[in-house]
Amino acid sequence: MAKIRVLVVDDSATMRSLISAALNRDPDIEVVGGAGDPFEARGMIKALNPDVVTLDIEMPNMNGIDFLEKIMRLRPMPVVMVSTLTQAGAEMTLRALELGAVDCVGKPADATGTQEALAEIVAKVKIAARASVRTNAGAAPTSAPTRRKDFMPSGDIVAIGSSTGGVEALLSILQLFPETCPPTVITQHMPATFTASFAARLDRSSGAKVQEASDGALLEPGKVYVAPGGATHLEVVRSAGLRCRLVAGDPVSGHRPSVDVLFNSVAHAVGDKAVGVILTGMGRDGAQGLLTMRKAGAKTLGQDEASCVVYGMPRSAFEIGAVERQVSLSSMGQSILDLASARR
């Protein structure tokens, strides 16, 4: 099998060297070049035709966001963004994911985190090489989304799990959610410093109130709760109503927070009064949990292969019988509301 050809773009020669060395140590990857700024990178993309580009966000002359926008318009290809894990870096990275970057990786902050960060870059480059590239990501919508003004809650809650490609998918879904939407809990695989900014970004585009989940928060209609990244898993529990619970623990299915943990807790807490949704992402996280939800009587949906950036999590769930129906991303928001409506 041919090696994955990678172009590394970073204004720091040290960082280019570190990333390139880590990638070249993997037998499936070949670094074909390194560029110090977007103008140099533009010529190298034309000359070298890489399979994947790793792109620093903060660079001189032209920042990574502007360059990514040009790439996605003129020559769409898999791009992995490399960003500092700061508030400003989070905002820019979320914009990059909206524009069509496959995934983001945090730059190592110190020597102790270098090997872990470099290993993550290698893993995400491999995922990116198999990803479907969206050529119209980040484009302005032709018209404002039509939200369900007649939506009547049935008392069901909605639980959603996503990973690679989930930023665009969740934005697409939640922009259709009205102020009366069912209580919704989300686990999206994302660095800890990004989830608050991500919740705020979703909040600006949705009719619902979207917030980062806090321990003990009461689940209410019209509200969406996003699992904090990093240290805890998000669960739903019964305690004077339905509430969010943040639980410390080891990664489950390779992740913390884990979609499996969320789905299992929803099955236990509400049984058949739920809609479970598994979206684009690599791996198997969420598949077993969604099956548990379906066995408890919940309605379940999976994103279809054609609209996924990475058809991994939904495929795993579908293959074990956890998915009742596969739905395209363009129809997913409406399908969720239909299943959670008192009028169905």
UniProtKB/Swiss-Prot annotation:
Gene3D superfamilies: 3.40.50.2300, Methylesterase CheB, C-terminal domain. The keyword Transferase does not apply. CDD domains: CheB_Rec, REC_CheB-like. Its EC number is 3.1.1.61, 3.5.1.44. The modification 4-aspartylphosphate is found at residue 56. Residues 151-343 form the CheB-type methylesterase domain. GO terms for biological process: chemotaxis. It is found in: Cytoplasm. Keywords: Chemotaxis, Cytoplasm, Hydrolase, Phosphoprotein. The active site is at residues 163, 189, 285. Its main location: cytoplasm. SUPFAM superfamilies: CheY-like (SSF52172), Methylesterase CheB, C-terminal domain (SSF52738). Pfam families: CheB_methylest, Response_reg. One of its GO terms (cellular component) is cytoplasm. It comes from the Bacteria. One of its GO terms (molecular function) is protein-glutamine glutaminase activity. Phosphorylated by CheA. Phosphorylation of the N-terminal regulatory domain activates the methylesterase activity. It is an enzyme of class 3 (hydrolase). It catalyses: [protein]-L-glutamate 5-O-methyl ester + H2O = L-glutamyl-[protein] + methanol + H(+); L-glutaminyl-[protein] + H2O = L-glutamyl-[protein] + NH4(+). Residues 5-122 form the Response regulatory domain. Belongs to the CheB family. NCBIfam families: PRK00742.1, PRK12555.1. Involved in chemotaxis. Part of a chemotaxis signal transduction system that modulates chemotaxis in response to various stimuli. Catalyzes the demethylation of specific methylglutamate residues introduced into the chemoreceptors (methyl-accepting chemotaxis proteins or MCP) by CheR. Also mediates the irreversible deamidation of specific glutamine residues to glutamic acid. Contains a C-terminal catalytic domain, and an N-terminal region which modulates catalytic activity. This is Protein-glutamate methylesterase/protein-glutamine glutaminase 1.
